[in-house]
Regions:
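Short beta-strand/loop motif that positions the catalytic acidic residue
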Residues: 240, 246-248
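Conserved alpha/beta-hydrolase catalytic His-Asp/Glu region
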Residues: 169-174, 184-239
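Flexible "cap/lid" loop of the alpha/beta hydrolase fold
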Residues: 142-150, 157-186
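Conserved HGGG/HGGXW glycine-rich cap/lid loop of the alpha/beta-hydrolase fold
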Residues: 54-102
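Acidic catalytic loop of the alpha/beta-hydrolase fold
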Residues: 251-255
Length: 302
């Protein structure tokens, strides 16, 4: 029997969702995806000056803290295939970003880059996290890099999984068209095409999570902040002296695999690899390899 405890969403995030009915439908889909969580978890709401942060927590209380930042519009439930591996040893904290579909609730409009750091610092302080491992997927990779550049004393190791707008900018071309069409004009057919372009193994994605992805775009106000996230400069990236893991799929339509080579040349302490037969959704496409590389990196293995 798998269970959750704690936070039930009562406040409305009208800065993200189109209306209360749309929000309720999305939250129901979020909870349906949570049924896929293979380990016990706690849902916790953290009050901050910017709004309420919703955090999914799994793993032994004595474990070293590992923070997970999800991809755009995916919410923390996107980690359902991976959380079982990560939480065996580590105390895992998966945080819903404040300005995207999820259970976090914003007090105001979108955050600027300084406010993003302040918000995360408030969340980490209230969770009692002074030093932790930090992993980010896709947009979460940019967030994790941005945070670490300003708080390197708090991050033990940094893990970047298919990090968009981090080493290179996204090139809008025919490869990215399906994903863009779904974002701009969401319907179920465009969702299918988008998923097929982002994943090499779309059949591995549970229907419950696909439904949540659909409602996370369909039932929310358009958010194109990812296009305003500037790639980091060579000097900024070179200042990351902590150990960094960079993983990119060989069929990632949002990242050129050459960023692995670029990371190897710029980052002082890096473990970078191209994951074969994986798209942008590499945590699903090649779950076993990605999880093994993550855990080996965390455990100090090369």
């Amino acid at each position: 029997v798998f269970f959750g405890c704690g936070a039930s969403k009562t406040a409305s995030n009208h800065f993200v969702f189109t209306n209360a009915k749309a929000e309720k439908k999305y939250i129901n889909s979020y909870n349906n995806t949570l049924k896929l969580w293979p380990v016990a978890y706690e849902e916790r709401d953290i009050t901050t000056s910017f709004g309420t942060a919703h955090v999914l927590i799994s793993g032994p209380k004595s474990g070293e803290p590992l923070v997970l930042l999800h991809g755009m519009d995916a919410s923390s439930t996107m980690w359902y295939p991976n959380i079982g591996d990560y939480s065996k040893k580590y105390r895992v904290y998966a945080i819903d970003y404040l300005m995207e579909p999820g259970k976090s609730v914003s007090k105001g409009d979108k955050l600027n880059t300084d406010e993003i750091i302040s918000w995360y610092n408030e969340v980490f302080a209230k969770l009692g996290l002074e030093r932790f491992y930090l992993a980010g997927m896709s947009r979460g990779g940019w967030m994790a890099t941005h945070y670490t550049l300003h708080s390197q004393d708090k991050v033990k190791k940094l893990m970047l999984l298919a990090p968009v707008q981090t080493f290179n900018g996204i090139e809008m071309d025919t490869k990215t068209m399906a994903a863009a069409n779904f974002k701009f004009f969401p319907n179920r057919n465009r969702l299918k095409k988008a998923v097929n372009s982002l994943s090499r193994r779309p059949e591995k994605i549970d229907p419950a999570f696909k439904e949540q992805m659909y409602l996370g775009v369909k039932n929310t106000k358009s958010n194109f902040d990812v296009l305003q996230m500037a790639p980091f400069s060579k000097d900024e990236l070179a200042s990351l002296t902590l150990p960094v893991l960079v993983l990119v799929g060989d069929h990632d339509i949002l990242n050129d695999p050459n960023i692995v080579e670029k990371a190897g040349k710029i980052l002082p302490d890096v473990n970078a690899a191209v994951i074969e037969d994986a798209g942008h959704f590499l945590t699903i496409d090649q779950k076993e390899e990605v999880d093994k590389r993550m855990l080996d990196f965390l455990n100090g293995k090369k």
